[in-house]
A protein has these predicted regions:
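Glycine-rich adenosine-cofactor-binding loop
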Residues: 99-102, 118-138
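Phosphate/diphosphate ligand-binding glycine-rich loop within oxidoreductases
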Residues: 8, 32-112
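Adenosine-phosphate binding glycine-rich loop
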Residues: 221-222, 226-281
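Conserved S-adenosyl-L-methionine
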Residues: 139-144, 242-245
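Rossmann-like adenosine-cofactor binding region
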Residues: 171-247
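Short, small-residue-biased leader/transition segments that mark boundaries at the very start
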Residues: 1, 21-25, 29-36
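NAD(P)-binding Rossmann-fold cofactor-contacting core
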Residues: 142-169
Length: 281
């Protein structure tokens, strides 16, 4: 395969950023891409620090791991596999699964000086990102989460997550129909934090918003969107028009979920300011 490597070193950095672009060889070559099981086994065999996991394997990779983090277990999805180390810092071949999506969302808010413990939240969506955000928030001290979604095939998944949160955390969670706009407006006016964790706002839905108009936002509501392209969605523009001052896109979540994964792999911090500079945030 062909590989391009860019390296930036700095004595200020605990970890040097190394970026690799790799053209994956065909499945018929020696590296075992043929099954998820063999790929996971290769983490052990090659003594890798870990791996990121993408769809559709996030919900099934747990079968081949030794441990699963509590949040990943509750939300039913793993995006990071770590080869655990012994007291000497050597990888052991014992693999643990995490979900850093939720961690990244809440870390991004913390970096903005927001203490979310005890907050009331309105969350739109029941997909992988929404589920990870809800579960991590519930475990880390969010008081109430009102989840809204259209009544599609994912609605029942939202009901399952609400049940798990209520049974396993001190957070009170409720599932609601997104079609009930009066209820949505009522809950948003009573909330401290709002998050749209759907794909509405990104291509090809960049001209749409789940929120009918700016009157749904109150000025002191913290508004977040998991979409990062475009940098400003229609929903974010509505919030700013309503006078909201704390409005954030998904770039912070994307950055910090990756940095948390790297920390889990290496035990080292990454140059956050440099990464923010390169991402333009």
């Amino acid at each position: 395969c062909r590989t391009r490597v860019n390296v930036r070193s700095s004595h200020h950095c605990a970890l040097t950023p190394i970026f690799l672009m790799i053209r994956r060889p065909p499945r018929s070559t020696l590296f075992p891409y043929t099954t998820l099981f063999r790929s996971v086994q290769s983490i052990r065999a090659l003594k890798m620090l870990g791996s990121n996991i993408s769809m559709p394997n996030k919900t099934v990779v747990h079968k081949y791991l030794d441990e699963v983090d509590e949040a990943a277990k509750l939300c039913g999805a793993i995006n990071t596999v770590v080869n655990l180390r012994d007291e000497n810092g050597q990888v052991t071949g014992k693999l643990k699964g995490y979900n850093t999506d939720g961690m990244g969302y809440w870390q991004a808010l913390t970096e903005e000086g927001i203490d979310f413990k005890g907050m009331k939240m309105v969350l739109i969506g029941t997909g992988g990102a929404a589920t990870a955000i809800a579960v991590r928030g519930a475990l880390d001290g969010v008081a109430e989460i009102e989840i809204f979604n259209i009544k599609d095939k994912f609605y029942s998944r939202g009901e399952e997550i609400v049940d798990l949160i209520n049974k396993n955390t001190n957070c009170k969670a409720t599932m609601n129909d997104l079609a009930d706009k009066d209820l949505l407006k009522e809950k948003m006016h009573a909330a401290d934090l709002f998050c749209d964790a759907t794909g509405v706002g990104m291509h090809p839905l960049e001209d749409l918003s789940n929120i009918p108009d700016p009157s749904f936002f109150k000025k002191d509501l913290i508004v977040t969107d998991t979409v990062y392209a475009p940098r400003e969605t229609v929903m974010m523009k509505q919030a700013k028009e309503a006078g909201c001052e704390k409005v954030f896109n998904g770039m912070g979540m994307m950055l910090f979920q990756a940095l948390i994964a790297i920390k889990l792999y290496t035990g080292k911090d990454t140059p956050v300011d440099y990464m923010k500079e390169k991402l333009g945030i």
